[in-house]
Every structure is written in C-alpha cells, then in structure tokens.
Amino acid sequence: MLGLGLAACGTTDVQEEEPPQQQEQGLVLEAGCTQLAANVADHTCHHVNNGPALTVNASATENFAGTSPNINTTHTYYTVNLTGSGSSRVGTVKFKPAKKAADSVGTQYAWAFYRNNATPLVVKSEDGTSTISPVLTHSVAVSGCALTTVSVYNLTGNTTYQLVFGPTSSSSVGIGAERVEDLRNYYFQDADGDGYGNTNIYKLTACVPPANYVLDDTDCNDSNASVHPGAGC
C-alpha cells in the first residue's frame, strides 16, 4: 500500500511507470471537491484529544492593532473565549497562514478551519475591508471527537486575516486550522472492484476520492477481479 498523509494539495491525475512521488507546491482547493477525506478530520481530532492545545481570549472588536490574539500555530487546537453575554457573544482573532519558502509571494493555499460548534465564522482581510468566502463547508462527525463542522478558505501565505466569530450564545469556540495540501493521500484506480488498485493510475487528493479508487496499490491485474495479491499475483 502506498499513501502519503503529508503531501501537497489538490488532485493530480497521472499515468506513469514509476511510483508517484510527493509533490510540493502551493495549491488551492481542487475544483469539484465536495467533502474533505476522513483522514483530514482524523488528523485534527488527534490534536483535539491529544494536543497541543492553547486558549486565547478573543478581542471584543474587529480591526484591532497588533498581532494578538491569534491562532497562528498549526497542528494546535485552540479554545477561543468570546466576549459579551447571552446570545450576543462575539470575538475576533487573527490568523497568518505560513508561506512555504520555495513558493512565490502571493501563493495561495487551502486552509481548513475545523470547529466544535455552530458559532458563525467570517474571514476578513486584516483591515476588515473585504470578506473571504469559504470554498467548502460541511458537517463533521468523528466518533470520540468534539468537532462538528469545517470550512475551507483559499488564503494567501504570509498575509494576516481576521477570524470574526458570532454572534452566538456559546462562550467559546474550539478551532483547529490545517493546511489541506499537507494531508493529501494517493488513491489508486480499482477498475475491477477487487479492493486492490493499479499503481500506475492514481489521484493525489485531500478530498473524498472518486468512485473505484482505493488506498491499496498492489493489484497485478486490474482488469480481472479474480487476480490480486494472494490470488494469482
């Protein structure tokens, strides 16, 4: 079986004789993605349940000066304490996604923000003059994990954004930010449906793979379901 849990984002459809290699490039969320794959939520849930974890007190106002409070540390689960009372609690923190050194200025990356409740989230530019729309939002359900929803945004590296929460009746929101491309997997075409994939035809994605693609790449005859490892290979 060949799969990468830490690679770059987007889907690559390639046919070749050599095993696929990890690709490193800044990539936005691929077109046609309707849901992130389970391993992305599982990764974030690991941090929810095992840390590292930090708590920050959100600013009561938007467009605040300085860099804090922020949730800039990736692979970290944050509890963001909101301000106000009743159903009018709000809060703002900053987020500055990293740019990989090899990428050019202005490179965008898909970032997934997993949260533990339905507190509204709006992503804005640092000065508050523009709002960034999510390219994907869907519910999350992982056994033993508090996460309930995820939204994905294409964000420019080394650029500061505001995350504006509320209004809500929740006193806090748990949130984990992950760069989607870091959590891609290789999936291999399983044309004969035997559960074993063709190592020469694959897709690299952090999204739910298309039908008839599997993580296993050990089929020696993908046109005959009776021939596979343990049965003729």
What do the predicted segments below correspond to?
Residues 184-233:
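Membrane-associated feature with strongest affinity for ZDHHC
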Residues 10-13:
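Bacterial signal peptide processing site
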Residues 15-17, 27-57, 96-99, 125-134, ...:
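C-terminal edge strands of extracellular/lumenal beta-sandwich accessory domains
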Residues 5-8:
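C-terminal motif of bacterial Sec signal peptides marking the signal peptidase cleavage site
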Residues 113-117, 165-167:
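Non-cytosolic beta-sheet module surface loops
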Residues 40-85:
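Transition segment at domain starts
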Residues 118-146:
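Surface-exposed beta-strand/loop patches in noncatalytic accessory domains
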Residues 67-106, 110-111, 146-153:
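Non-catalytic, beta-strand-enriched accessory regions in extracellular/secretory proteins
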